[in-house]
């Protein structure tokens, strides 16, 4: 724990000593590309696709959204269309529909251009398998013997969220937890999300006795204690996602910020083709849901 506070102090000192002068780097400009953020899952709901145009790094204007596109997914037999949302420019939504696990889906996007041509984009993603159920969720401070996870920060207890479930034997499956508190989505951006590759623990009962014996627990989220109240409802949507999504996620996170020289060593990966016309990702997932009610185990009776 000492190393945790030492790192905090060092970061603070570096912040005080850092230069505040703006440095503007002259970057080569290119033609706008089409940004695609589309998802499809086994949940019975309206699935979304968001289409926009890229802009220069220093652009301060509103992002230009794509209008009038034709968007659909198909498994080769059935086709599901995303219809343009007239109240949200650039958003396209399906009718309520559920995808099927272990099924390959192809996303197709046709974007009309001002000269009458059409830009045709496509992507494929296998909607992966998922666990059958989450047996329970426990919210508690981390109690491992090592310092890999803090239990206290800024004089407040950290409450970690631990799901208990039988994981799939496939080590390439990645789990992404989506967290709600009292029906309010908390992980609504990628920077607030976690990706959990279980790796060598694939096939284990997650957070069960075998993992405890190895002093290994896997939390999926945390709360500062002051942000939790007795009887708060905490819901976990555990998404199983394709393994190639993890490279997109990490390069995207590395590329955030205001300095073009501090980021990923190459362009953010995309599974949208042709790659010289588009950026972004077509994201498939299967989802299993569980909910718990927070009880303060240290509350005085």
Where are these regions (language model features)?
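Sec-dependent signal peptide recognition
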Residues: 3-10
């Amino acid at each position: 724990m000492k190393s945790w506070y030492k790192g905090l102090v060092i970061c603070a000192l570096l912040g005080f000593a850092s230069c505040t002068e703006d440095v503007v780097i002259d970057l080569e400009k290119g033609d706008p590309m089409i940004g695609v953020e589309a998802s499809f899952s086994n949940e019975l709901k309206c699935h979304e696709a968001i289409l926009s145009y890229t802009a220069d790094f220093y652009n301060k204007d509103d992002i230009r959204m794509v209008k009038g596109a034709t968007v659909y997914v198909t498994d080769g037999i059935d086709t599901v269309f995303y219809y343009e949302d007239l109240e949200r420019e650039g958003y396209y939504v399906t009718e309520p529909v559920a995808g099927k696990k272990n099924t390959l889906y192809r996303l197709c996007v046709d974007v009309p251009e001002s000269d009458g041509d059409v830009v045709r984009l496509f992507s494929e993603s296998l909607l992966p398998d998922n666990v059958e159920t989450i047996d329970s969720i426990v919210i508690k401070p981390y109690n491992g013997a090592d310092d890999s996870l803090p239990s206290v920060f800024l004089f407040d207890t950290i409450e970690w969220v631990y799901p208990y479930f039988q994981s799939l034997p496939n080590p390439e499956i990645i789990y992404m937890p989506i967290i709600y508190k009292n029906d309010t989505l908390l992980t609504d951006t990628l920077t607030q999300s976690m990706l959990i590759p279980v790796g060598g623990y694939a096939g284990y009962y997650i957070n069960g006795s075998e993992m405890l014996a190895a002093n290994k627990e896997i939390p999926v989220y945390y709360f500062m204690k002051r942000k939790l109240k007795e009887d708060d409802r905490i819901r976990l949507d555990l998404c199983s996602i394709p393994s190639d999504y993890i490279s997109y996620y990490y390069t995207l996170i590395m590329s955030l910020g205001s300095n073009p020289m501090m980021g990923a060593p190459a362009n953010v990966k995309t599974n949208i083709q042709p790659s010289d016309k588009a950026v972004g990702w077509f994201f498939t997932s299967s989802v299993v849901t569980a909910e718990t009610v927070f009880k303060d185990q240290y509350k005085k009776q």
